[in-house]
């Protein structure tokens, strides 16, 4: 991909392992594609080693999930799983990718997950740092001779099992009622990580979280996002009302065991 305006991504979602983006924001990614935005996925590591996975199998699963979500581009940064750290060498790799892909929005996983991989929190820190480094001048030789680029917008997709209750500057919820089934189907692609018994537990948790998140805004299913700054607006009515027309009717939540068709 070149760095011309026509090739730039609208949204680049970045996570540490294949399956993290599907769990945190899979419904929104599928919705962005349906809305006509240019979307890319970037896994920082292969996710291996794991007890039942291999590099080749995880790559096939990630590709299958990409197809389910309808996202046209999925890349892997090749950083080490289990040892992912926010260190200068990794910042160079990720900042170089930001310079090459030149996204308008970087969608970053966020949160501390002590019951799961520490890679999750390190990815959060690394993405923030690489976003800053990607704009630095007089260092082009450290970024593969790519041109400096500042990612205009950073949006957090918090892990639903974050260990902390965070006080973000701003949060909002995306309605994923029409893409929730795609989200679950994409997660199910990772059979090496989620056998039938474990997928049933993950599906139950993800479904319950999406219902609880969406219900706060009148949606059947929702995904939470956060910003590192307050929301700016010039029209209070449009901001809270969603436009000048009458709001669309809100669908009622379905049975958690029955995702929308």
Predicted regions and their residues:
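Active-site rim/loop-helix segments in enzyme catalytic domains that contact anionic ligands
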Residues: 1-102, 238-239, 243-245
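Metal-dependent de-N-acetylase/amidase catalytic core
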Residues: 2-12, 88-261
């Amino acid at each position: 991909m070149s760095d011309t305006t026509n090739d730039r991504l609208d949204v680049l979602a970045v996570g540490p392992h294949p399956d993290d983006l599907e769990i945190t924001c899979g419904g929104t990614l599928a919705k962005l594609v349906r809305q006509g935005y240019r979307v890319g996925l970037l896994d920082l590591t292969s996710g291996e080693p794991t007890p039942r996975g291999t590099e080749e199998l995880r790559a096939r699963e990630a590709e299958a999930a990409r197809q389910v979500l309808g996202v046209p581009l999925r890349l892997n940064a090749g950083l080490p799983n289990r040892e992912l750290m926010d260190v200068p060498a990794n910042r160079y790799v990720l900042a170089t990718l930001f310079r090459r892909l030149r996204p308008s929005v970087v969608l970053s996983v966020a949160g501390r997950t002590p019951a799961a991989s520490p890679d999750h929190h390190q990815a959060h820190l690394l993405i923030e740092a690489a976003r800053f480094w990607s704009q630095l001048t007089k260092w082009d030789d450290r970024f593969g001779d790519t041109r400096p680029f500042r990612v205009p917008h950073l949006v957090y997709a918090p892990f639903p099992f974050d260990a902390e209750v965070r006080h973000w500057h701003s949060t909002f919820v995306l309605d994923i009622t029409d893409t929730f089934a795609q989200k679950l189907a994409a997660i199910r692609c990772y059979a090496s990580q989620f056998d039938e018994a474990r997928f049933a537990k993950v599906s139950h948790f993800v479904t319950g979280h999406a219902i609880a998140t969406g219900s706060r805004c009148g949606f059947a299913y929702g995904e939470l996002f956060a910003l590192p700054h307050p929301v700016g607006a010039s029209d209070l009515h449009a901001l809270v009302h969603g436009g000048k027309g009458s709001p669309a009717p809100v669908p009622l939540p379905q049975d958690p065991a029955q995702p929308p068709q």
